[in-house]
């Protein structure tokens, strides 16, 4: 694709050794290679005046990740990537690969419109009762036996859903659904505010042994 070009790869694997991260950046900085190819770790904090082109592959995977903060985090990350290009005397260009170029995140990114993004994102969160306009908790379930993990998540959802002020979403498999032999499921609890959630979670802790067998462990992420 780029004949004659040399690449520097920077990710968790290549930067694992002591001093490897800085060594790779130093090599790229003195132009031992033409292209720096890496994961999110190359998005911010790097200053190479001769870099004039930045590219993002499959930006949709970040924007559509199953998390209410996904679009916000993607916008911030893409803005950081854009800042890596054109830091010297030559102007830079940024290419973003997407199947949805009309997504508001990308349109506002193109315009560098922070205020416009905040306006749309906050309006959506208010409508859906997501933080900071509502309470949200994620219950994560782990275990080697998929049936027991899913069963515990489903039973917990039924128990929490008994409170009419709480909306239960899921359970659903996480991404990835299985990691190092451990199955991963989660369910989300939505409520008008954190106080309601704290009451429900307090009741859940008192009764967790009723729904969570020894084959599954769990923890809470309170937004």
Question: Regions from the language model: what does each represent?
Answer:
Residues 1-65, 71, 80-223:
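Accessory helical-bundle/CTD segments and flexible terminal tails appended to RecA-like ATPase motors
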């Amino acid at each position: 694709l780029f004949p004659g070009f040399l690449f520097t790869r920077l990710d968790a694997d290549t930067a694992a050794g002591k001093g490897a991260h800085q060594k790779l950046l130093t090599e790229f900085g003195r132009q031992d290679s033409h292209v720096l190819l890496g994961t999110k770790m190359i998005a911010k904090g790097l200053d190479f005046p001769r870099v004039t082109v930045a590219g993002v592959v499959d930006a949709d995977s970040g924007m559509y990740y199953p998390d209410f903060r996904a679009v916000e985090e993607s916008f911030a990350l893409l803005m950081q990537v854009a800042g890596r290009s054109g830091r010297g005397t030559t102007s830079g260009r940024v290419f973003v690969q997407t199947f949805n170029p009309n997504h508001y995140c990308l349109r506002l990114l193109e315009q560098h419109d922070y205020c416009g993004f905040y306006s749309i994102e906050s309006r959506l969160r208010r409508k859906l009762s997501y933080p900071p306009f509502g309470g949200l908790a994620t219950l994560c379930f782990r275990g080697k036996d998929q049936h027991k993990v899913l069963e515990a998540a489903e039973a917990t959802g039924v128990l929490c859903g008994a409170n009419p002020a709480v909306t239960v979403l899921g359970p659903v498999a996480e991404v990835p659904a299985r990691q190092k032999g451990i199955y991963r499921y989660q369910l989300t609890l939505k409520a008008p505010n954190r106080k309601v959630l704290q009451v429900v979670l307090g009741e859940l802790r008192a009764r967790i042994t009723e729904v969570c067998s020894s084959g599954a462990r769990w923890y809470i992420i309170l937004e």
